[in-house]
């Protein structure tokens, strides 16, 4: 099945999670890193390609699924985690998925923040969503698509957007590390849908580094910072959560304050 919203669980597939349909078995925490091997990051060729050195000394190119600048992370010679591409016919045979920064593995695959959040929601780790009835992802409403639509047992409906954060200065995480017109548009669309009866939230996920709090990068993207301040003022549920990467596992390390 090609629908990205479908979660595979053994021989069964669900386009949504429904309470009673799905029993968590721990697979999602391991599947991202179970084939990871150590390597050395050499240089970023372009937004999506990096040169890496494998443990046998072979220099190859790897796909980087993150358009952020990440200059503080992608330093020549830093230890990295790579895994074989799922498509053996792809031009780049490897995915660059994490680098070491200050002794912590930092996940570079921005889309995996959604995978982590999907797991945390389904396991009842997120306060306010313990009594979920149904979880959908990549929910399309009109011409827009949102990361999650969650229906609670009470019938309350939520739309959630998830943002991956790996830009950290002295323990303080900032989003974004580069201007994001798309990110701002998502928040503006959520604000509009709130007026149509949806409850809405923006959840930030820090991708491996220990952080004290999460804030908005006014210097890099003042427009995004402004729309987030408006969202908070209008009652949008804005929260941050921390992940720790200890391959092959990903651990939920709780909520962090928004500043």
Where on the chain are the PLM-derived regions?
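Short, positively charged and aromatic/hydrophobic N-terminal segments
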Residues: 23-24
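Domain-level recognition of nuclease-like catalytic cores that cleave nucleotide substrates
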Residues: 29, 207-259
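Conserved catalytic cores of phosphodiester-cleaving nucleases, focusing on short active-site segments
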Residues: 39, 146-177, 190
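Short aromatic-glycine-enriched beta-strand elements
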Residues: 47-51
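Short nucleic-acid-contacting surface segments enriched for D/E, G, S/T with interspersed K/R
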Residues: 68-81
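Acidic-basic catalytic patches of nuclease active cores, encompassing PD-(D/E)XK
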Residues: 71, 102-136
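Flexible glycine-rich surface loops and low-complexity tracts that mediate binding to linear polymers
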Residues: 78-87, 242
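Nucleic-acid nuclease catalytic cores
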Residues: 171-181, 188-220, 242
């Amino acid at each position: 099945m090609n629908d990205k919203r479908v979660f595979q669980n053994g021989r069964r597939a669900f386009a949504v999670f429904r309470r009673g349909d799905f029993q968590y078995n721990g697979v999602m925490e391991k599947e991202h890193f179970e084939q990871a091997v150590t390597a050395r990051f050499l240089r970023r060729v372009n937004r999506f390609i990096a040169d890496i050195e494998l443990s046998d000394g072979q220099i190859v190119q790897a796909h980087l699924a993150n358009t952020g600048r990440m200059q503080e992370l992608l330093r020549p010679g830093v230890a990295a985690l790579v895994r074989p591409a799922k498509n053996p016919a792809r031009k780049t045979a490897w995915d660059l998925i994490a680098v070491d920064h200050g002794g912590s593995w930092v996940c570079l695959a921005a889309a995996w923040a959604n995978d982590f959040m999907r797991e945390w929601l389904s396991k009842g780790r997120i306060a306010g969503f313990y009594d979920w009835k149904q979880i959908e992802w990549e929910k399309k409403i009109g011409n827009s698509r949102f990361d999650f639509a969650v229906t609670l047992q009470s019938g309350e409906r939520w739309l959630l957007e998830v943002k991956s954060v790996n830009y950290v200065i002295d323990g303080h995480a900032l989003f974004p590390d580069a201007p994001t017109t798309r990110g701002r548009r998502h928040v503006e669309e959520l604000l509009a849908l709130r007026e149509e009866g949806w409850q809405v939230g923006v959840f930030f996920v820090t991708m491996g580094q220990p952080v004290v709090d999460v804030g908005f990068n006014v210097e890099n993207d003042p427009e995004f910072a402004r729309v987030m301040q408006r969202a908070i003022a209008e009652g949008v549920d804005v929260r941050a959560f921390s992940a720790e990467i200890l391959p092959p596992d990903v651990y939920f390390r709780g909520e962090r304050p928004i500043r």
